[in-house]
Amino acid sequence: MPQTLHVHSRVKDYDILFTDHVLKTLADCLGERKQRKLLFITDQTVYHLYQTLFEEFAQQYNAFVHVCPPGGQSKSLERVSAIYDQLIAENFSKKDMIITIGGGVVGDLGGFVAATYYRGIPYIQIPTTLLSQVDSSIGGKVGVHFKGLTNMIGSIYPPEAIIISTIFLETLPQREFSCGISEMLKIGFIHDKPLFQQLRDFQKETDKQGLERLIYQSISNKKRIVEQDEFENGLRMSLNFGHTLGHAIESLCHHDFYHHGEAIAIGMVVDAKLAVSKGLLPKEDLDSLLQVFERYQLPTSLERADVSATSLFDVFKTDKKNSEQHIIFILPTETGFTTLAINKDDHQFVEKLDSLL
């Protein structure tokens, strides 16, 4: 497996580096910046699991640490403000750097701070969950939630580099591992059927090298899509399969009941059911999706009686993918994907949605 993937970006090119030696790879990435101030942003879970790693950072660099509570509620303007306070207190300049080390929440949060502090300072991502390694760290999207709405404030701001190490996955709980698989299945279902089939048959306990290949294959797929459509005007929209409903579920559950990959799994099932109902997708493909989700213990239906189709529809109206008058869903097809535009006043769709949940 190649050690590096180079990503072309209209904003700034960057490398994805695969390694078992995080400290050395980070040192190589920093180069002359080793002498600059570095703010490591992480969460309490990662900080306690890898305290010796942070001690190494403190010995080698002019390092500061910001530790967030774990979970989606840290993706907030309040947390951004707290990090700004620390950067200002430590007199960080435009030449200093942020390094995120954690899952998707930490990466999105730290990247947003980097994009906005002094109108942009450099940052490096070290994703520690499967989901962040294969999905959220790739493509430059950064942002935070606002008033409960998912990823309402953000930008596209690529990092200097992304450091991928499967060593971090050795301490990853099964629930988080399955959430990463959810995003890998998403890209496989639409763009790479062999990847989907390999994930369906994968045996985590006995095939570490197989996992590394699947991660590389997933990242390569996303890299290809992002390079063709960085600002999500066409092909990259396909990566929102499951996300219109998934993000609404996360918002209504306050970003703590379902993890991201779980909410997206429910969204993918509903999108696939819509596609089947419109004759766009064979029923056998939906059945295959349901089977593999069940194998990885991912939810396939909404388990919250307090979240109604009506309340979900109201949240859909704030989705960033929408056009002026329409809510946009991404539907899988036999050969790829298509978009479904639902009028924001189409209350009949609420009844349809209720039957699919």
UniProtKB/Swiss-Prot annotation:
GO molecular function: 3-dehydroquinate synthase activity; metal ion binding; nucleotide binding
The keyword Ribosomal protein appears for this protein: no
UniProt pathway annotation: Metabolic intermediate biosynthesis; chorismate biosynthesis; chorismate from D-erythrose 4-phosphate and phosphoenolpyruvate: step 2/7
Keyword tags: Amino-acid biosynthesis, Aromatic amino acid biosynthesis, Cobalt, Cytoplasm, Lyase, Metal-binding, NAD, Nucleotide-binding, Zinc
BP GO terms, sorted: amino acid biosynthetic process; aromatic amino acid family biosynthetic process; chorismate biosynthetic process
Cofactor binding note of this UniProt entry: Binds 1 divalent metal cation per subunit. Can use either Co(2+) or Zn(2+).
Subcellular location: Cytoplasm
Transmembrane regions: none
Binding-site residues, NAD(+): 104-108, 128-129, 141, 168-171
Pfam family, one: DHQ_synthase
Protein known as: 3-dehydroquinate synthase
